[in-house]
Amino acid sequence: MPPLRLTSVLHTALPDLSENGRALLSVLGCFNGHPPCSHELAQWLGFHDRYQLARALRREGLPPLEVIGGWARTLYWMSEAEGSGKSLRELAEREKVDPAIAYRLVRRVTGRRWSEVRREGLALTMLRFRDRCAKAAPRPTANLGTPPFLLAAGDPIPRPPAATTRPIRSTWRGAETRARTTLARPGHRVVQGISERVAVDGAPFDVAFAASGEALVTRPHAAAVDVLQLNPFGVSHTIRVGPTPTRVIPTARNGKNGHVAYVTTQFVEAVRIIDTERRQMVGSIPVPGHPLSAAMSPDGHTLFVTTNQDRLVAISTAQRTVVGSTAIPLTSPQLTIHPSGRWLLVPCWRAGVIVEVDASTLAITRRFDVGGVVQDVVVAADGQSLYAANEAGWLDVIHLPSGRRTAKLEFGTGALGLATSADQAHLFVGLLEAGRVLILQRQGLIERAVIPTGGRPRLIAPHPAGDGVLVANEAGWVDLLR
């Protein structure tokens, strides 16, 4: 997943911005220079409202959002025109924009006609953009507990509305189920339906259980990680980490730093360190590119992270620095480590392959060609079987000792999230577009239940003791399945 061309252009034009200024440019790059409404953009970057964002832009030395957005749009069209030879009219019509509006936008932000801008070329236009933002300068990182971009605004840390736990009607039981004071232990009982649901805004993506028994949920569109308590089920705290937190990796339950978790925050190009006891961010580890997925070595000494520069990097958790890296084709937000700790299994998204990497040398040892668009992967506790969800509509099973695919189960719809139950008896598969979670008996891949969650179920976290399963849903909630 290489960097978007517009993102690279913007970062090249303004190389000296703070990490949060670069995060703003990354968001503009994601939307081809046409960001969502200013309020939504403010939420992505961790601000309370658009006014706070505007004040931060002024302190960062950047022009108003309307101006910088217009320049980003113009640079996008310039980049596309040079790459494809298309006219501005063709580019505008492709995006369902009135060509007259596009021509006026270019004239307004650059002071020149499109024909003049095209003759000057992209490089000179980038220089003019840099000159327009000449006051931009790097800003020092103040308190790590609060995003520097937020501190620059001089405003208090915003508190999101309290999430609510509400009763829902279970499709499988046909009766209303309310929050209970204790959670039942299902053991080997198959999960039957949704027990409870808590509203979580910001497009929840990943969910994982911390050593304390609480759960951590990443909110990419809210620049935060929420702490979920199970009894009663709800959000207890919010930890601000910076734009686009994607994966969260708590340390081992029996480790000396069991209260620490690592969060890949894409647009600040760093892995954040949070303390789940103190409920705050306590550190940051810069990485080359936007960090996507992560996995911790069994001994807790090394954190492995993939980035959008198509690289796998190894981070020393003691030194808090990158100690090694290797090239990986088309990385994605998914990654897992073999129970032995000897190998990493890295899905390569649209490349349709999974690569096995030696954890000590970062050398690629094997490739498994499965086709499609590989998403989440898990390895059975005995280390014998690799399971891979595929967005093209199936699940692969690979026998790791031999490297052969031993089974393939078709779903007819894209699969994304994947997890094994605490007792290793079942697999949980999130069907993203269908809005369902499929429960399979691991032996024989026999379907045991289908739970309609609605929305867009993302990643899945079974409780280590078997006390239910959490499913992050991009539509704005987290489900507790029992």
What are these regions (language model features)?
Residues 163-482:
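Predominantly soluble domains enriched in secretory-pathway, periplasmic, or organellar proteins
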Residues 1-171:
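Alpha-helical bundle regulatory/interaction domains
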